[in-house]
A protein has these predicted regions:
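Residues that form generic nucleotide/phosphate-binding pockets
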Residues: 22, 135, 176
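Short, flexible, solvent-exposed loop/turn segments with mixed acidic/basic and small polar residues
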Residues: 106-111, 185-188
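Glycine-rich, often proline-containing surface loops adjacent to acidic residues and nearby aromatics
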Residues: 111-121, 193-194
């Protein structure tokens, strides 16, 4: 590693602090605290693909009712937007932690999830391709800005990054790489353009 373990921890904190400030400003988001566990049967936990097993256990203080560790905040975020009274143009973000016991692990994936999660209220008129593209560009700008600041603080991590985004559809990828899997197509187009946003996934 280019950094020591201690430097790595400092860098992680710096990146997380800076990126959340930049992203929240770009997308008009408030930080909220998300649950790690929810009551089983509440309908809040997301089933993902419907086959992943949830981590569950009983809680003595609520008559041994079963609780589950969250796998995704997709349903909870929408509920939170409603309960907190957010309006069009406003949203929330959270530093999500979860456990996905059946995930395939690699250098990018772990059974322990630590990721940014966000949701925003939009109008019916904003449900279009142009608004999606502008949102993606705003996120990329936040990432690039963070990367530049990190490079200044940690020159050993410096490498060029620009704000250009190439938009492609799943059908275009299938036409271009007919003999590849969906994951292989994503990797190939990312290598070709540096970064891309795939649309019309399903």
């Amino acid at each position: 590693s280019a950094l020591t373990l201690r430097e790595t921890q400092h860098a992680i904190k710096y990146i997380k602090d800076l990126f959340q400030q930049t992203l929240s400003f770009a997308l008009t988001l408030d930080r909220v605290t998300a649950p790690l566990i929810v009551e089983q049967g509440s309908g809040i936990n997301d089933d993902l693909n419907g086959v992943e097993r949830k981590v569950d256990f009983t809680i003595k203080e609520i008559d041994n009712k079963k609780a589950e560790v969250v796998q995704s905040l997709a349903k909870w975020k929408r509920m939170a937007l409603y309960r907190y009274g957010y309006r069009a143009g406003e949203g929330i973000y959270t530093d999500m932690n979860a456990i996905r016991r059946d995930d395939d692990t690699d250098n990018l994936h772990s059974i322990f999830v630590d990721q940014w999660d966000w949701e925003k209220v939009i109008t019916r008129e904003q449900r279009n391709e142009e608004f999606l593209k502008e949102t993606v560009k705003s996120i990329v700008k936040a990432i690039v800005y963070t990367k530049r600041k990190v490079s200044l603080r940690y020159p050993v991590l410096a490498n060029p990054m620009n704000e250009t985004v190439t938009f492609v559809t799943t059908q275009e990828l299938e036409n271009r790489y007919p003999d590849k899997t969906s994951k292989e197509r994503e990797n190939l187009v990312a290598k070709e353009y540096g970064r891309s946003e795939e649309r019309r996934v399903g």
